[in-house]
């Protein structure tokens, strides 16, 4: 039964504490660090522990904490062809024996002694040649009770670490990010804290804390160790103090007598009316000290907690009663220099601070659980965490080995990390299946620990079956099966072609800022989190290669760079990265804003803010694998659309003629701490020269947690007399919250008229009929037939390719589905005279949609290395084609402009008409003077000859697609 703590006068008179307000004594446990050089034997033959192996003198050594990779032990990796991930320089998989002589001091006699290895792989321990036991914990610290093995004096300690495939269930070894070659690799070693510890025989084994923000109290469950059942009286004392905030708050020392009939003592500690709450905005933490005093010893332990209540209310999350929105990122343990998780608080704090600069308040750990340092850092920085079990795929209820292992791992990590305020959610793993197995796991964990919200996994059944029983929230890409060629159940805006028609909303739908996920949300009555939002590829940044100074080598980068060099485009590498990256950032913004525009939506988890170096090399981040900027978008720019407060402009399209009225609704997504009442939103419409075309204000009355419609804007655009990109800026006065939207305005007197070529310009889709005219000095605009040149062209992809081309091409071909065109957007020169009347950046933007969707870029590999199309399409790292959407040649005495987009099919769109008009006007000017000459024969070969393509090996996903 729970007790309320009260002061015990007996202890005060006994002199245990002189005043109820002073602190408890510090943790006095003695430790011996095991850091240093250890003898090393590698079972390279895979024979296992042979007789006498322990007595065999070691001929090698390794510094621990560390890994065999870091010590350059194992086999040198001679494979220079791997492109699916970064390459380990040295590889070892199997059993490694680490040995060391340790000295035990006299004062440790008669104490409880334990060995702690904070993170490792399955182990077996020997003391002086005698086997102690084994441990297979991989998500938490391994602990061995060595009290009966270590007397004062010198002892031989041997630790066998096994990272072989037989050491854990196959599903854990083969799928999870605890073992994955894609990120942290299957390392062997011991990392993090590594020590022996002495404690009183009668002491504190564990402290579990259950904060209650509403009651401003915390319940402590203290597990005691008392081998001597005849021990006399014992007293537990408690003291809590806020330690990371300017606002001081502490409790008196409070003491109760121990009931030795119960191994676990449960008490409620009231924190008082001045108690501080923990959240992303005010991450106030308390350090609770618990001291056990008996007649013979004192044992003091400490635990950190935050006073918070993270719950669901309808379809949304709440923190301490206030509605919150999860702006999350996926984490797969990407640490390229060390190839294992960081084990120190400062590294994790740095990562979280970078993420917060980009508006992130939530991390999802894909099929792995981070270490203690991560939780500590998240507590301090105010980040909401969702760790997962080390598994991805099917859980067969009849697979007792796997189910028992996952139950053990789950119980361990809840016991190890649940005190942390940042640990607010828990998922069973990634893209799971197996209803009975999942139900058994989630029901067990929910019954045993109610401090978190629970999900049966992330994107289970790829969302086709909807939410699962017992889930508190639903992380998914869809809510049930969508209607044919529709996206009505989708919970994110982009998909692979294997998983959704035409890649989903963004690639298929005419650009707008109105669409959201309301139709999917209506199908679920608990909070939805968009699973792995984004996955928009960015061309690799080869300047990053020099950063890889650790155990992982960027051989994939080097191969991709060599391929581009062989394709004659190495000089464009940086431009490819910048153009695809700028476009990728805009696509991420569109997906994020779709989430924010959805009423009563739970949040999203990006894949990703940073690159993912494995599974085919998925460069999907606006930051690199080191969480460092690629120079694509500043944190300030990103926070305009990814923050606790975001002004949104909801409009049906981005391209207008100047006789139209671009009416749009302004909404405010307010997930800050407070209401936005009594403020005003200022808006301005500016042209390309920053001249103000229109402006106004809207009064705001926006409640906390609300997605509020605050007014309709109808900015005046009639004064825009030429084709121009204008910017609608929104800002909430007196705050840092602002956002802006690009609109493209085209003059109606031109845009509404049929586009016609001037006299002397031949427009055709059949060049053969006009070759004589061309050779004799004519000007020809050629729209080659898509059907006639399928083998020499690729398809038109608006967004950048999803995740990576190799994997989803393999999956699509296996399923018999259309393969994505695989391209990464356009690269052009905005100052080129062909684009003089078509405002554009050097990269894709929304006005290119109808042009690109009707395109079929031409493969120009036969041309010389220095040839550049006017509008080039960036290819992926697997094919490396030189692709042209708009390009020109001198043919004989004539001038040929080739457009690989069926512009006639989209003449209902003003932007397509404007593009058509701009290139025709260019052909009328002296600037139309192609310098690259082709003979008629070479031109015909370009459009008819077979294209050389290299062999691409198949690559599949762990998840299966229907």
PLM feature spans:
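Catalytic beta-strand/loop cores that center a nucleophilic Ser/Cys/Thr
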Residues: 507-512, 789, 808-910, 928-962
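Accessory beta-strand-rich segments of carbohydrate-active enzymes
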Residues: 32, 41-45, 88-89, 93-204, ...
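Extended acidic/polar, glycine-enriched regions
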Residues: 151-154, 225-313, 719-753
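Substrate-binding/catalytic cleft of secreted carbohydrate-active enzymes
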Residues: 362-623
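Beta-strand-rich binding/interaction modules
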Residues: 125-127, 217-256, 265-267, 661-701, ...
């Amino acid at each position: 039964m729970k007790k309320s703590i009260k002061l015990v006068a007996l202890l005060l008179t006994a002199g245990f504490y002189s005043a109820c307000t002073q602190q408890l004594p510090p943790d006095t446990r003695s430790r011996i660090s095991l850091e240093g050089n250890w003898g090393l034997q590698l079972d390279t033959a895979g024979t296992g522990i042979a007789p006498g192996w322990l007595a065999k003198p070691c001929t090698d050594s390794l510094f621990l904490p560390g890994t065999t990779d870091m010590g350059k032990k194992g086999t040198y990796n001679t494979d220079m062809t791997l492109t699916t991930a970064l390459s380990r320089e040295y590889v070892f998989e199997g059993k490694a024996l680490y040995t060391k002589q340790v000295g035990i001091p006299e004062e440790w006699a008669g104490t409880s002694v334990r060995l702690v290895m904070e993170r490792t792989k399955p182990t077996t321990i020997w003391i002086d040649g005698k086997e102690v036991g084994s441990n297979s914990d991989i998500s938490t610290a391994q602990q061995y009770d060595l009290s009966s093995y270590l007397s004062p004096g010198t002892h031989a300690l041997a630790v066998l670490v096994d990272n072989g495939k037989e050491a854990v269930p196959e599903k854990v070894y083969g799928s999870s990010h605890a073992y994955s070659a894609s990120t942290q690799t299957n390392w062997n070693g011991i990392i993090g804290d590594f020590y022996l510890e002495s404690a009183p025989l009668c002491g504190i084994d564990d402290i579990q804390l259950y904060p209650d923000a509403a009651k401003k109290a915390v319940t402590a469950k203290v597990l005691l160790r008392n081998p001597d059942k005849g021990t006399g009286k014992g007293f537990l004392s408690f003291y809590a103090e806020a330690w990371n905030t300017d606002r001081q708050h502490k409790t008196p020392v409070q003491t109760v007598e121990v009931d030795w009939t119960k191994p676990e003592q449960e008490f409620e500690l009231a924190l008082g009316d001045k108690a501080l709450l923990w959240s992303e905005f005010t991450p106030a933490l308390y350090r609770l000290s618990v001291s056990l005093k008996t007649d013979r010893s004192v044992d003091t332990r400490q635990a950190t907690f935050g006073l918070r209540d993270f719950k669901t209310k309808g379809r949304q999350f709440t923190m301490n009663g206030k509605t919150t929105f999860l702006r999350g990122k996926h984490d797969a343990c990407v640490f390229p220099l060390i190839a294992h998780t960081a084990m120190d608080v400062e590294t994790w704090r740095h990562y979280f601070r970078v993420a917060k600069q980009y508006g992130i308040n939530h991390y999802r750990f894909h099929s792995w659980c981070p270490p203690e340092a991560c939780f500590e850092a998240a507590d301090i920085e105010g980040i909401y965490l969702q760790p997962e079990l080390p598994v991805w795929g099917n859980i067969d209820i009849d697979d007792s080995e796997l189910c028992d292992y996952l139950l053990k791992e789950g119980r361990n990590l809840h016991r190890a990390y649940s005190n942390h305020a940042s640990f607010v959610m828990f998922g069973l793993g990634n893209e799971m299946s197996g209803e009975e197995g999942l139900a058994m796991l989630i029901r067990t964990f929910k019954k045993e620990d109610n401090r978190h919200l629970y999900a049966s996994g992330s994107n289970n059944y790829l969302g086709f079956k909807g939410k699962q029983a017992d889930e508190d929230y639903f992380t998914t890409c869809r809510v049930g099966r969508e209607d044919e060629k529709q996206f009505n159940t989708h919970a994110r805006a982009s998909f692979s072609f294997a998983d959704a028609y035409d890649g989903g909303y963004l690639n298929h739908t005419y650009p707008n800022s109105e669409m959201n996920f309301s139709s999917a949300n209506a199908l679920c009555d608990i909070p939805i989190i968009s699973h792995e939002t984004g996955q928009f590829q960015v061309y690799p940044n080869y300047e990053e290669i020099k950063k890889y100074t650790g155990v992982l080598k960027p051989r994939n980068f080097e191969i991709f760079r060599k391929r581009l060099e062989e394709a004659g485009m190495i000089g464009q590498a940086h431009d490819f990265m910048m153009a695809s990256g700028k476009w990728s950032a805009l696509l991420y913004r569109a997906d994020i804003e779709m989430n924010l525009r959805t009423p009563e939506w739970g949040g999203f988890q990006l894949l990703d803010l940073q690159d993912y170096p494995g599974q085919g090399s998925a460069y999907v981040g606006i930051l690199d694998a080191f969480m460092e900027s690629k120079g694509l978008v500043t944190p300030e720019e990103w926070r305009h659309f990814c923050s606790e407060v975001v002004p949104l402009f909801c409009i049906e399209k981005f391209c207008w003629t100047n006789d139209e009225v671009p009416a749009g609704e302004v909404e405010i997504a307010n997930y800050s701490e407070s209401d936005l009442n009594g403020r005003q939103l200022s808006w301005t419409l500016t042209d390309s020269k920053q001249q103000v075309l229109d402006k106004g204000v809207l009064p705001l009355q926006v409640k906390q947690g609300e997605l509020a419609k605050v007014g309709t804007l109808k900015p005046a655009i009639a004064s825009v007399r030429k084709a121009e990109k204008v910017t609608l800026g929104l800002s909430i006065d007196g705050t840092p919250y602002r956002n802006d939207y690009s609109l493209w305005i085209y003059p109606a007197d031109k845009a509404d008229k049929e586009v016609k070529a001037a006299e002397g310009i031949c427009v055709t889709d059949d060049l053969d009929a006009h070759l004589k005219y061309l050779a004799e000095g004519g000007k020809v605009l050629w729209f080659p037939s898509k059907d006639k040149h399928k083998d020499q062209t690729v398809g038109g992809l608006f967004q950048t390719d999803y995740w990576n081309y190799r994997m989803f091409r393999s999956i699509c071909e296996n399923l018999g589905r259309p393969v994505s065109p695989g391209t990464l957007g356009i690269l052009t020169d905005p100052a080129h005279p062909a684009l003089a009347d078509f405002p554009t950046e050097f990269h894709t933007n929304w006005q290119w949609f109808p042009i690109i969707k009707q395109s079929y870029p031409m493969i120009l590999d036969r041309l010389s290395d220095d040839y550049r199309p006017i509008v080039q399409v960036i290819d992926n790292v697997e094919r490396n084609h030189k692709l042209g959407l708009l390009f020109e040649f001198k043919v004989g005495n004539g001038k040929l402009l080739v457009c690989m987009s069926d512009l006639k099919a989209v003449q209902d769109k003003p932007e397509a008409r404007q593009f058509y008009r701009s290139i025709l006007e260019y052909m009328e000017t002296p600037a139309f003077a192609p310098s690259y000459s082709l003979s008629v024969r070479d031109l015909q070969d370009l459009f008819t000859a077979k294209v050389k393509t290299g062999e691409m090996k198949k690559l599949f996903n762990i998840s299966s697609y229907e």
